[in-house]
Amino acid sequence: MHQIAAQWPAKAMAQIFITGNTEIDALHYTVRNDFHHPEIEWAKGSRLIAVTAHKRENLGEPMRDMFRAIRRIVEEFTDVKVIYPVHLNPQVRKIADEEFGGCERIHLIEPLDVVEFHNLMKASYLIMTDSGGIQEEAPALGKPVLVMRDTTERPEGVEAGTLNLAGARMEDIYRECRRLLTEPEKTNICPAEMAGNSPGRRKKVDS
């Protein structure tokens, strides 16, 4: 017997049970309507972009390209603010400080705990990331995701239109982010199911 968290790997396999995704289930407990955080308060009235970027393969020029695209967006759209909980990796911090320094509408903050970050995503207009798990969590909150990578392990999100695969080059990231900001219908998405409700989801998938 095989157990999986989503539908798409099951298409050509027998004896598979969908068990749900506990990562998504956690959102029911962490996201709160009465949550308050000073950074989220700072961003009220703006279109908030939450950023995560730390993948080792992006260190160096690829990461600088990402950050330059983000800064270009902030400089162009005066109603956009960015909150970036910076990874503890010294290389990431150095690049972030160099590329974002002096930009008042980009806040570099310390890493958040899971409750804080889930509520940051909920308060955001969109999320820009090179991370994997966020590609599942953000769509479950109804938030579009701009994936700053060339590939993704979540192709079902791309097919559903909740993930926007931009690559890691500055012009591509800038162009895709600008599209999401200037075409509001691209960000008005319904929360994706993303296989939550683990206790109630154990069912056999027919091949």
Each language-model region and where it sits:
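Nucleotide-activated sugar donor-binding and catalytic core shared by glycosyltransferases
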Residues: 1-84, 89-207
